[in-house]
Structures are given as structure tokens and as C-alpha cells.
Amino acid sequence: MATPETRRRPNILVTGSPGTGKSTLGQQVAEKLGFVFIEVSKEVRENNLQGDFDEQYNCHVLDEDKLLDHISDRLDSDEGGIVVDYHGCDLFPERWFDVVVVLRCPTEKLYDRLQSRGYSEFKIKENVECEIFGTLLEEARESYSEDIVHELQSETTEQMEENLERICELAGEFKNEHTMEQ
């Protein structure tokens, strides 16, 4: 079982409310660093890792145990180099991630993005409230060591480019620190 001390490359979690740019940024980070990208929603759909259908949210409920079993070998590897995109973080073991990025977005912009995706008013309201209260940032800070949690703004193209560079810097810092220790 890998730990940050034994991993050669960092595992990175990109989290935030739906519509903050997690998938876009996660994929860009993985491509730029030559890492593997795991888009949890896609893994769930393609590997039947969901439970019952939730009528209120108009989606299937994630079977967390199935998901964790499905991805654990990759995230427990000493090689590292995995970027995971998911809108939550408290279900993942703390040992899996070396960098946790929480994307934030102004609520007006988030509302527009979710509306353009066809989200119901109920789902939009839930996600906007989550963003207003900083629920996912708080969850990340409670689930992981605060020194690996990074809050980044994700409203503009320029911010997305800056976020890509910042995450690549963090990955480089991890690699440098762990190369010196070994």
C-alpha cells in the first residue's frame, strides 16, 4: 500500500461543485504531466458502479464501496501519477492523495453553467448553496491535511490556465521533495 513517502509521483484530487471545471482541468493536468486521468462519473457509468435511481436528483446514487474497490489498485500504487475528478472528497482514503484542489466559482457563473447543462432548478439550487457555504472546501479541509488542500478560483479562461500551471508546480514540488528523501 503506497503512502506519500513511497509514491514516485503525486496523486491529485480535483474537486468542487459541478460546473466549476473539474473535468476540464483534471484532464489538462493529466495530459501535461503524463498522468492517468480518472473521471469518477465516467468510471461509474462505464463500470456499473451505481446503486438505485434518485428521483429527486434525477440520477443514480453512487455505490461508494464498488467505486473504491474499482480504483483502489491504481491509487494504492507506488507509481502514483493519478488525477481524480469528483465533486466530493470525504469518501476517499486520506493516504490516496498528495495534492487536493478545490475549484471555486462565483455563484452567478455557476448558476449559468448548470442551467446550460439542463440541471433542474432543485439541483441548481443545491449546488449553488453548496458553493455559497464553501461545503466542499470545508469537507476537503476536514478530510485531508490542510497543507495539501488548495483553493483555486475557476471563473475565467485565464484562471484555468493559472490553475493548470499551479497544479503542475505542486506536482513538481512533490517530486522534488520525495526525490531528495529517497
UniProtKB/Swiss-Prot annotation:
Annotated EC: 2.7.4.3
GO biological process, one term: ribosomal small subunit biogenesis
Stretches the record annotates as Disordered: 1-20
Keyword annotations of the record: ATP-binding, Cytoplasm, Kinase, Nucleotide-binding, Nucleus, Ribosome biogenesis, rRNA processing, Transferase
HAMAP family in alphabetical order: Adenylate_kinase_AK6 (MF_00039)
Function: Broad-specificity nucleoside monophosphate (NMP) kinase that catalyzes the reversible transfer of the terminal phosphate group between nucleoside triphosphates and monophosphates. Also has ATPase activity. Involved in the late cytoplasmic maturation steps of the 40S ribosomal particles, specifically 18S rRNA maturation. While NMP activity is not required for ribosome maturation, ATPase activity is. Associates transiently with small ribosomal subunit protein uS11. ATP hydrolysis breaks the interaction with uS11.
Protein name: Adenylate kinase isoenzyme 6 homolog
Organism: Caenorhabditis elegans
